[in-house]
């Protein structure tokens, strides 16, 4: 059998493959594969891949073909380049509330708004809210607040009490200096079903001539005045102060508000007064002057209030009773 094979392949030249040649070929293939893998990781295009043996090159192309099919034809940079900033903002979803990811977003947003406004106007002077105003202007109830927030069972009564506490603190700001922003917030949370008995006095301003117009009462006297900055001239019913009030105590009463604020001789007063005697007329003008000074400078109100000039004296003369000589005086007792 061996002789037949030798005679059959005698005319052929079969090269012998030595061991050192096979190891050299193996090392060469290992180096070529390592270079191809490093180039594929560091580059992005297939044109920069180094040349290798045909069989390894075909295998490399066969392995890379599925990855190229999965890759998107448009990169992220190409997509953003085709859109402007306005379109990107429309595509991006942004929550409407800053507290969207909280447990109670609507209520927390309301509380943050009230705290910011309270911190902004914390330096303004405060007042004592009268009971009549509290009864006439009530805030919305718990059920109305639930309907307003649309948060269901997330809003508890303790949350509602925290809200009312902040609203009451905002309501204590002086009416003469209350900002429009605070007034809008208070009206937003005020109950519409409660009838407004008290009409809140708005801040008075100067007229086109720079005058402050006010009026006041004392006993049966009614005084209307115009106050303007000047040299300290006072006219009462068209007459000078000394001519109309010969009594020195009446003149002191009239000028007392200027002494409280240390503004003597800096304003002109034009007054019209009717009814009563010189005491009632002079004090009626005094209260009217105090109100006019607040129009010029609202910060003077605490000093004038402390002096008792912002609230008129409501005492009047007691009437005469039957069987009495005067209001309480009885006639002289005579035995016979």
From Swiss-Prot:
From the record, give the cysteines joined by S-S bonds. none
Which organism's genome codes for this protein?
Answer: Candida albicans (strain SC5314 / ATCC MYA-2876) (Yeast)
BP GO terms, sorted: translation
Q: Which family does it belong to?
A: Belongs to the universal ribosomal protein uS9 family.
- Where composition is biased (Polar residues), the residues are 65-81
Name used for this protein in its record: Small ribosomal subunit protein uS9m
UniProt-listed InterPro entries:
Ribosomal_Su5_D2-typ_SF, Ribosomal_uS9, Ribosomal_uS9_bac/plastid, Ribosomal_uS9_CS, Ribsml_uS5_D2-typ_fold_subgr
- Gene Ontology terms, cellular component aspect? mitochondrial small ribosomal subunit
> Is this entry keyworded Mitochondrion?
yes
């Amino acid at each position: 059998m061996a002789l037949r094979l030798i005679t059959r392949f005698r005319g052929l030249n079969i090269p012998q493959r030595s061991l050192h040649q096979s190891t050299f070929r193996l090392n060469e293939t290992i180096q070529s594969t390592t270079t191809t893998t490093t180039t594929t990781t560091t580059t992005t295009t297939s044109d920069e891949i180094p040349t290798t043996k045909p069989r390894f090159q075909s295998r490399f192309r066969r392995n890379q073909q599925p990855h190229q099919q999965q890759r998107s034809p448009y990169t992220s940079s190409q997509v953003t380049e085709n859109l402007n900033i306005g379109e990107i903002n429309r595509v991006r979803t942004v929550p409407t509330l800053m507290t969207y990811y909280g447990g109670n977003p609507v209520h927390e947003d309301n509380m943050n708004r009230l705290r910011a406004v309270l911190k902004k106007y914390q330096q303004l002077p405060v007042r004592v809210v009268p009971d009549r105003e509290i009864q006439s202007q009530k805030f919305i109830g718990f059920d109305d607040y639930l309907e307003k927030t649309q948060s269901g069972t997330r809003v508890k009564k303790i949350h509602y009490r925290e809200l009312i506490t902040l609203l009451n603190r905002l309501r204590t700001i002086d009416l003469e200096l209350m900002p429009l922003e605070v007034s809008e917030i208070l009206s937003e949370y005020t109950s519409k079903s409660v009838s407004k008995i008290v009409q809140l006095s708005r801040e008075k301003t100067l007229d086109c001539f720079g005058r402050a117009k006010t009026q006041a009462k004392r006993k049966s006297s009614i005084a209307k005045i115009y106050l303007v900055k000047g040299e300290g001239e006072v006219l009462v019913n068209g007459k000078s102060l000394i001519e109309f009030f010969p009594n020195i105590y009446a003149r002191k009463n009239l000028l007392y508000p200027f002494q409280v604020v240390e503004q003597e001789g800096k304003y002109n007063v034009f007054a019209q007064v009717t009814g009563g005697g010189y005491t009632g007329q002079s004090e009626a003008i005094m209260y009217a002057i105090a109100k006019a000074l607040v129009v010029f400078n609202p910060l003077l109100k605490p000093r004038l209030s402390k002096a008792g000039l912002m609230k008129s004296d409501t005492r009047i003369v007691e009437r005469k009773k039957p069987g009495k000589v005067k209001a309480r005086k009885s006639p002289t007792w005579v035995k016979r």
